[in-house]
A protein has these predicted regions:
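Short beta-strand scaffold segments in enzyme catalytic cores
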Residues: 53-58
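Short hydrophobic alpha-helical segments enriched in small aliphatic residues
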Residues: 21-25
Length: 177
């Protein structure tokens, strides 16, 4: 497992084309439009009174699943954006193995979601914001580098820090009024 953050040991550059904005980290290519879709999902969660986290799963340049948190509405602790997106993607592909898929999420995954990502064989995780909990960071790294499952996961963190922090701060301000 490799963990990349802008400004750390890698040159980061944005290339604007007429259709998309691409984000280069070494040889890894991230398309901004998918992260934008994850933020659209996060906004849906916000409007429903859910913690605003969104997830988008992409395979071969096509969106195959989108989801947002619905934990409160469903009264189910596992209904995180990443889990729901994985369920939708697996159903669409008729396979629990999501080989060749990438996931775009607005916040670094919790350990439960990281385990599901690893088990699903998702290759790249693009996270808008790193979870500030140091225990979470340690656990996530251990999950992604574990050889108990024959898959390798690359984690790209802190790609849209300000946008994600603002969304989360606004949500928690609104629920504490």
């Amino acid at each position: 497992m490799e963990v990349f953050e802008p400004g750390q040991d890698r040159k980061v550059a944005a290339l604007r084309t007429s259709f998309h904005v691409h984000f280069f980290v070494g040889v890894i290519l991230m398309d901004y439009k998918y992260m934008d879709l994850a933020f659209v999902e996060a906004e849906k969660a916000f409007k429903k009174g859910e913690v605003p986290i969104g997830a988008v799963i992409v395979k071969d340049g096509k969106v195959i699943a989108k989801a947002h948190n619905v934990k409160e509405k469903s009264n189910c602790a596992v209904n995180h954006a990443e889990i729901l997106a994985i369920l939708k993607a697996s159903k669409k592909l008729r396979n629990w193995r999501l080989d060749g898929c990438d996931i775009y999420i607005t916040l670094e995954p919790c350990p439960m979601c990281a385990s599901a990502i690893k088990q699903s064989r998702i290759k790249n995780v693009y996270s808008a914001l790193k979870n500030k909990d140091k225990n979470n960071e340690t656990i996530i790294k251990e999950i992604f580098k574990s050889d108990m499952v024959n898959s390798s996961v690359n984690l790209f963190n802190n790609l849209f820090v300000e946008k994600s922090e603002t969304l989360l701060q606004n949500f928690f301000i609104s629920v504490r009024k």
